[in-house]
Design a protein with these regions (language model features):
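Amphipathic alpha-helical recognition patches that constitute DNA-binding helices
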Residues: 69, 73, 96, 108, ...
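Histidine- and aromatic-rich ligand-binding microenvironments
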Residues: 66, 90-98, 152-156, 176
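A short, conserved structural fragment
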Residues: 53-63, 143-153
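Short, Lys/Arg-enriched N-terminal segment that forms or immediately precedes the first helix
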Residues: 1-9, 79-98
């Protein structure tokens, strides 16, 4: 598993995980190939590549190709992160989850719930700087695709406790 900071940086962009998984599968790729394979717009792909370069996980291949057709390769620091992304993407496909079904905070949330069940306030504290609205929407989407379960404690007032379902534990196992 990668560190919490790397996981947050990785999930900051919707396409960073699929992009790194593709780069790991192909051992590098050209811009045009990534555009076609992932079906992204040029601006989204350029922004995603810039974010990966800023993280130090990706570089332009200095000894290849024409400047207008750049190729990108993983750095040594990017290889373990890309391997992590491959595992997540493989498990996502097994679970038949579309990219839109895993919102930005879903992977950090699964990593947190892998340790133990938690209340909303504990999740919010662990996932800072998440907003209450973002956490609520993420939990709602994760409940809809059966990755997270919600149980109510028998107290007054009732307290919601969130935990992983079997599908959620399978995805968490791919993240370890």
């Amino acid at each position: 598993m990668i560190g919490a900071d790397d996981l947050r940086r990785l999930t900051a962009g919707r396409w960073l995980v699929p992009l790194l998984a593709h780069l790991a599968d192909e051992r590098g790729s050209r811009f045009a190939v990534m555009l076609k394979r992932l079906g992204l717009s040029r601006s989204v792909l350029a922004a995603s590549l810039a974010a990966l370069q800023a993280a130090g996980w990706l570089i332009r291949n200095p000894g290849h190709g024409h400047p207008l057709r750049p190729e990108y390769v993983l750095t040594r620091a990017g290889e373990p992160v890309a391997a992590f992304c491959q595992g997540v993407m493989a498990q996502r496909e097994k679970l038949e989850l579309a990219p839109g079904q895993l919102p930005r905070w879903s992977l950090p949330l699964i990593a947190r719930l892998d340790a133990e069940q938690a209340r909303f306030s504990a999740l919010r504290a662990a996932l800072r700087p998440i907003t209450p609205r973002a956490l609520s929407l993420t939990l709602k989407q994760m409940l809809q695709v059966d990755l997270v379960d919600r149980a109510l404690e028998d107290e007054f007032p009732p307290i919601a406790i969130y935990g992983l379902t079997g599908r959620g534990r399978a995805l968490a196992a791919a993240m370890r």
